[in-house]
């Protein structure tokens, strides 16, 4: 994973400590990723100490502080700048103690409604800075493990991958000698709002055996939402949009879809012989390109839309649509 660009971490001493911490974190992340990659069934039982490790918390703080959302405060009213003014080292020491003795409790997420095209609105959750730092530390620990499991078709919110890479992959499938002729596009229904907590936690447990880390992840999922009307709502499904952990957890949940499609007849896991037989029989072969909750499949037959839509995982029109490549 790439290092950070130089940032203002709060003084020369803290800046030096950050670079030392970053080196330690990157080394541990590399080990976690290798262990997960080399053993697809390995469960990690001692991750909690990494989450509250001073190096991980410091790197997590720098990520939160350098993010454009550092100006935004959660329900406690404190922005990252306000915390920085009161002293970063003391803040991180107190936070580490709270996480380590398990007295830390996430606060409700402050909800804001962001306008979307067509007059609709999208929910955005703003966590407290304290919660963001713990989430960022959790992500530093969990991401290299789950990255070992994610398939190449997934591009959204992954290190070293971006939207342009997904577009390039789609173009690659459309070019010779592949010449896929159809694109079926669809959005995952209410992806961030409707993900089942129990199903998601089952997926996380497949890799994480540390009950303290599992409890921490679940606590963030259940933290509740404080709406713009100041009414506190329970959060029984989904991951709050805007949360640092949400993109990773959404990819963990949606990796089930990636694996299902990869193993389906005519999918990426099919042999060349199987794909040739399907072509002779008039059945489609296909590839999947997923960017977060947006899916695009390249197909060689109009039957593709009839196959993929009834799975219930994709919205129909206007969320899903078929396009003939080269058509006006």
Indicate where each model-derived feature is located.
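Long amphipathic N-terminal alpha/beta scaffold segment
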Residues: 79, 83-86, 91-113
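N-terminal core-binding DNA-recognition domain of tyrosine site-specific recombinases/integrases
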Residues: 122-125, 181
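Glycine-rich phosphate-binding segment of PLP-dependent enzymes
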Residues: 142-150
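Conserved polymerase palm-domain catalytic core
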Residues: 99, 108, 117, 149-313, ...
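Non-catalytic, polymerase-adjacent accessory regions of viral genome-replication enzymes
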Residues: 1-89
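Nucleotide/phosphate-binding loop and acidic/charged catalytic motifs
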Residues: 138
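Short beta-strand-to-loop capping motifs
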Residues: 83, 128, 297-301
